[in-house]
């Protein structure tokens, strides 16, 4: 979260680092969930705009990286305390971010969109005797799944009202295919599958992005009406059951 403030020692390694260019930094055309990065601008006392100021954008991204490094070091301190207390082998650790963050992608500096950068959040789960420690998975899951996962890992019955599903199968088999994820913000709703993201708007406008081709840079809704209709049905079905 803003502001991006980390102790200086975590920023120093990035001082002369070469930062990769921002992918698809252009403002998207047509009706989208794009916004003017108002939350970021409220903290911007330098009165510079990272959208058209490359040096400032690079500096902001370095400070973001420093915050990630700071968070990593803080987690290390927590793990050290668990080890010193002798309870690390009886503890489930979950690191989870409640949202992602645009660092200039789609000309947005912040969250509050229905694009991948805002909705894809970090999730790390570790527990004693985990089958494949350190193995990443690309499976699509939802934050609803965290609670039933903790219930299963701690041998607690999952309440009937819980809508999520345990992630234990993905922890045991990281290559396992995920399901779908839905989200909404304001008057927009979205569903994400392995290949597509569909975004619908209250005024009827539709966005469809193909992650096997252009990612979320080209709206292909007009070219794939059958896909739009199928995903619209799946989206509404999920939301109606929520």
Where are the predicted features?
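C-terminal cap/loop subdomain of S1 sulfatases and analogous C-terminal strand-loop tails that border
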Residues: 99-105, 126, 131-132, 139-147, ...
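Conserved residues at beta->alpha junctions
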Residues: 222
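Active-site-proximal cap/lid insertion segments
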Residues: 1-140, 153-156, 160-161, 214, ...
